[in-house]
Structures are given as C-alpha cells and as structure tokens.
Amino acid sequence: MTLTKAELADLLFEKVGLNKREAKDMVEAFFEEIRNALEVGDGVKLSGFGNFQLRDKPQRPGRNPKTGQEIPITARRVVTFHASQKLKSDVELAFDGTAA
C-alpha cells in the first residue's frame, strides 16, 4: 500500500480534528514548504524522520539502448532523501519478516 496526500489529509481529519478542507490545505502547505526550500537550494531536516538534500551530478557518458550510440547524459541536480536512524530502527522493529 502507498500512502497518498489525500490519505494524509484524511488522517489529519480523523486524528487531529481538523475539517477536511483545513487538513487538505495543511498537507499541501507542508509539501509546498519543502518544495520551496529545495528550490532555493536549502536542505530540509525533519527530526526523527530524515533529510532531503540536493546533490549535483556531473555529466557522464551514456548509451542509447536501441542504437548503442554513445550520448552524453547532462549534468543535473537531484533531490535525495536519507532516513534518520530513528526511522530506520522503527521500520526495522515493525518489520516481522512476513512482508511480500
């Protein structure tokens, strides 16, 4: 199962008591703030959860899988996520080895 933004809003509605519109707006605002920080080059640290960081990847050689022709893969900036040790250990404790 995948948790969606709509499901997060429903959980805020159920557990926190916000109305559905406020819950949806709060989820949207949360992700908008993360997006804004990353767009200006800032990292995002969520204590007990993890860090979103930007990483510059240099240009590198690639290959067209159809033709085999060598083509350059341009330099780019990517977003990376590193889970906190707490999140990793919580997930490990919850995992009982029966997941499909």
Swiss-Prot record:
CDD domains: IHF_A. SMART domains: BHL. One of its GO terms (biological process) is regulation of DNA-templated transcription. The keyword DNA-binding applies. One of its GO terms (cellular component) is cytosol. Disulfide bonds: none annotated. Gene3D superfamilies: IHF-like DNA-binding proteins (4.10.520.10). PROSITE patterns: HISTONE_LIKE. It comes from the Bacteria. It holds the Pfam family Bac_DNA_binding. GO terms for molecular function: DNA binding; structural constituent of chromatin. Keywords: DNA recombination, DNA-binding, Transcription, Transcription regulation, Translation regulation. Heterodimer of an alpha and a beta chain. Belongs to the bacterial histone-like protein family. This protein is one of the two subunits of integration host factor, a specific DNA-binding protein that functions in genetic recombination as well as in transcriptional and translational control. This is Integration host factor subunit alpha 2. It comes from Dechloromonas aromatica (strain RCB). The lineage of its organism: Bacteria, Pseudomonadati, Pseudomonadota, Betaproteobacteria, Rhodocyclales. The gene is ihfA2.
